[in-house]
Amino acid sequence: MHNNLVILAGGASSRMKKEAVLDNLSAEEIAQANERSKGLIGVGASGRPLLDYLLLNAKKAGYKNIYIIIGEQGELFKEFYGSQNLNNDFHGLNISFAVQYIPDGRVKPFGTADALFQAVEQFPELNTQQYSVCNSDNLYSAKALLALRETTSPNAFIAYDRDALEFPSERISRFAIAKLDQNNQLLDILEKPSADVLADYKDVEGKIRVSMNAFKFNGSTLYTHLKNCPVHPERDEKELPTVLLNSVKEHPNTTLGIPFSEHVPDLTAKEDIADVKAYLKEHYPVLDWQA
């Protein structure tokens, strides 16, 4: 089992910065949503950020080395998790920071695949090891994170049952869906699925599976695909699902979809803040690092 978890936190958070359609937020919450990276918004006990809870679950799952990919203006992460670039001790986790630099000529970061490529360039030891990757603005369970550590598949991702996600149906319908074979090996990822093709994408349990960006990768075989990832024609970004599919084309039967049926709290927009706060209050009344 590997001990490395890379957390994607360098994005532009553009949807979070849009004006809220609800009026259930305080002035402080609105200010944080507009100014902070999503994972640093204070939705938890005593105003602690969502990322605390993700790190807690990572620790419970047995991860030791955490690499947080931050943007060029990501100094606030260091106020929360350690002032050094390398080897900060946060409740027994070893936290280091990679920086996703924005290329000349661009205003926004170049996508999740670019973020991970910059991270493995800055921490080349990852290219000879296995590691997990996830978002900073989702709260994955310790059980799901442990499944990524435990799998013997070279590459893997958590394949969530779409029906178990507690989001509005309109939002869920926009999620990309994964096509798996009878052994749960990844065959394809379909973006913006239309209702008429959904039946073709059901797995052996009859479930529609979606990815929430919780991955496990073999560093040595993934590197080439990260380096050569093409730009998505519509979104003008380099994205991890593209890397995954290119890897599958070259190495079939090496990317396992691990079936899970549970909700994954998500901080995408201001409308999510109250829901995530309520979820944490119910499921994590205390941030207990000793448990």
Each model region followed by its residue ranges:
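A structural signal for short hydrophobic beta-strand segments in well-ordered beta-sheet cores
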Residues: 40, 177-180, 257
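Conserved beta-loop-beta/alpha segment of the NTase-like Rossmann-fold superfamily
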Residues: 92-177
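Cofactor-binding loop segments of dinucleotide-utilizing enzymes, especially the Rossmann-like FAD-
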Residues: 8-11, 71, 136, 160, ...
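Conserved alpha/beta core of the MobA/IspD/sugar-nucleotide pyrophosphorylase nucleotidyltransferase superfamily
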Residues: 189-291
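Hydrophobic packing residues within well-ordered alpha-helices of enzyme cores
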Residues: 16, 77-81, 148, 226, ...
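Conserved core of the sugar-phosphate nucleotidyltransferase
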Residues: 141-224
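Phosphate- and divalent-cation-binding pockets in alpha/beta enzyme and binding domains
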Residues: 76-79, 143, 243, 275
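Conserved N-terminal catalytic core of the sugar/cofactor nucleotidyltransferase
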Residues: 1-7, 13-31, 44-130
